[in-house]
UniProtKB/Swiss-Prot annotation:
This is Nibrin. The keyword Glycosyltransferase does not apply. GO terms for biological process: blastocyst growth; DNA damage checkpoint signaling; DNA double-strand break processing; DNA strand resection involved in replication fork processing; double-strand break repair; double-strand break repair via alternative nonhomologous end joining; double-strand break repair via homologous recombination; homologous recombination. The lineage of its organism: Eukaryota, Metazoa, Chordata, Craniata, Vertebrata. It comes from Mus musculus (Mouse). Coiled coil: none annotated. It comes from the Eukaryota. The modification Phosphothreonine is found at T337. A motif (FxF/Y motif) lies at residues 738-747. It is found in: Nucleus; Chromosome; Nucleus, PML body; Chromosome, Telomere. Component of the MRN complex composed of two heterodimers RAD50 and MRE11 associated with a single NBN. The MRN complexes dimerize on DNA to form joined MRN-MRN oligomers required for DNA double-strand break repair. As part of the MRN complex, interacts with MCM9; the interaction recruits the complex to DNA repair sites. Component of the BASC complex, at least composed of BRCA1, MSH2, MSH6, MLH1, ATM, BLM, RAD50, MRE11 and NBN. Interacts with histone H2AX; this requires phosphorylation of H2AX on 'Ser-139' and promotes NBN recruitment to DNA damage sites. The gene is Nbn. SUPFAM superfamilies: BRCT domain, SMAD/FHA domain. There is a cross-link at K569, K580 (Glycyl lysine isopeptide (Lys-Gly) (interchain with G-Cter in SUMO2)).
Amino acid sequence: MWKLLPAAGAAPGEPYRLLAGVEYVVGRKNCGILIENDQSISRNHAVLTVNFPVTSLSQTDEIPTLTIKDNSKYGTFVNEEKMQTGLSCTLKTGDRVTFGVFESKFRVEYEPLVVCSSCLDVSGKTVLNQAILQLGGLTANNWTEECTHLVMSAVKVTIKTICALICGRPIIKPEYFSEFLKAVESKKQPPDIESFYPPIDEPAIGSKSVDLSGRHERKQIFKGKTFVFLNAKQHKKLSSAVAFGGGEARLMAEDDEEEQSFFSAPGTCVVDVGITNTQLIISHSQKKWIHLIMDTLQRNGLRPIPEAEIGLAVIFMTTENYCNPQGQPCTELKTTTPGPSLSQVLSANGKIIPSAPVNMTTYVADTESEPADTCMPLSERPEEVKIPGLEQSSRKLSQETFNIKEAPKPSSKANNVASDTLVRGKTPSYQLSPMKFPVANKNKDWTSQQQQNSIKNYFQPCTRKRERDEDNPELSSCKSSRMELSCSLLEQTQPAGPSLWKSKEHQSQNATLDREADTSSVGGMDIELNRKSPDRKPLPTETLRPRKRKDVDLATEEEVLEELLRSTKPELAVQVKVEKQEADDTIRKKPRMDAERNRPLNGGSEPESNSALQEDEREKKDELQTESWSTKHEIANSDGLQDSSEELPRKLLLTEFRSLVVSNHNSTSRNLCVNECGPLKNFKKFKKATFPGAGKLPHIIGGSDLVGHHARKNTELEEWLKQEMEVQKQQAKEESLADDLFRYNPNVKRR
């Protein structure tokens, strides 16, 4: 940075440090550089400016330029030569500057300020560069002999640290230059540099007391030693530190012909390559050559020198324990000196590499399309029912894993809920048999809680699309959730009559699976699969239910259902209460169109009860079951299964899924609000807000609306302005007369 110092023999004074980008005015009153007791100094005598472009901030061979401009009456002299008034001149370090004709003499000097930083983050480097730029200094990326300071937040053993210690340069914190800049701006003394020494943060040093100040012993620490490098990367990294310490760095290649006595000569230190380092790429022949040199050293009782010993020898200022081939290796040395630092190499090499192969075998469900998306034949379904409890739970878990794996995974909780729903939809045969659900024999509280959760689970978003929705767009998700709800409600009533269901199951196993398995989604998926691939063999006629027995089975199922409802009245009271709380809104909003259109199958079959509460609960239960059975009956008689094609199976049931959510109907029913007085129009309607000028033309001001403005003359203001002008003219005349009195020209030529 530039400084303006009083010349020898002149009046003593403090040096002026000049910041970059600031104009310093030299004068005798109200200026940056004040010179008093000199009548030849003008008020604005000269201007000093330091210009420092940002582009050359990292170029250590360029220094900022200092220019001076003369604005005085009696002149400014540079090296005893008078400057021309109004022109600028570039100053060099050591130039003598005289302001006026008396003893106001100064000299300018440039104090080098080249800063090198190490282990600083991006924000720290930005703040440091701004402070160095204002101080007129330079920044360097690599350490050179011109560097004056090393900036580190914490001392680590790096190449820059070793070079700074050898060159005797101070290692300081980045906050030092911020405080130095504030002191220059306020014209105070610079801060003490010793109070800005950073702490030592290096595991290789530990808690030992280390003197990091500039010591002369470090400049000749490697004098008389020759460091032999067997790797070019090591030579490039450490050769500068060896050269600064007075030693010689030599790079040896495989082609060089040197006698074996050269490596064992006194003062020769062979730097250990570190073949185990994964960052080094060494060929097989080079490894063989390195092993040959190491064997030579071992035969002579010598050892290779690790990289880190070069830095430790500089820090502790000794070569007896470090960098000594004849000495014992340091046991406390655990790391090598890396390029950036000891700590940074750990993070650079910290790649996770497994030492041994780990058994990562994972058992998942079969993900082939046909076993996952299709179903088993109806004759094989009873074998699946007879799975024990443990295998059944593991099978459910594997199906849940398979569903979650294909899902986009919005959250773990949502995936679990959705996977349970998908498992229930895929294997609905578990829902109607009491032998497949031993969990239903628990207490009533758990049963009601399970029913409440099952109702809630139908409104969770599904994370995986079903193939049957893509193949058959006629089946909607609303129908599926509605059908699943009816099945789950029937599931809650099964512990009352296990013997009835068992006898019913034995009767239906002679021909095919029971009626409940036919109403599951498996049957629907079989029909859709056969429709999709006609070349598949149709099911044998022995497994199909005859048409004449359809009505008999329906009547039998109605009787079984009535027996279950009579035997489970206490449980229904608890279950319907929970059902009423959770599904009251959705059931109340559901249209009654399906129930009115279809013939009810079990209406009026139950006996009347004395309690009004049980009647309401039974009506709600019958309504849900009526819709589910009427849906089955309607789908069974639908035209979709009466296809004339011989390839498709006939006399089967198609499962249709119903939803508790009401679909959007015509808009007229929504716009009408039913009241006691009749239908009223919906009052929650909004109309567009009108904007200015929408209905008529805007009102334009003009013509007679404009009134002319006549300015009146203010005589008092004019008189005051005239008086001020006269006062200013009088003051100017007085100042010119005063300047004429102080004019002195000793070189006036007389005629």
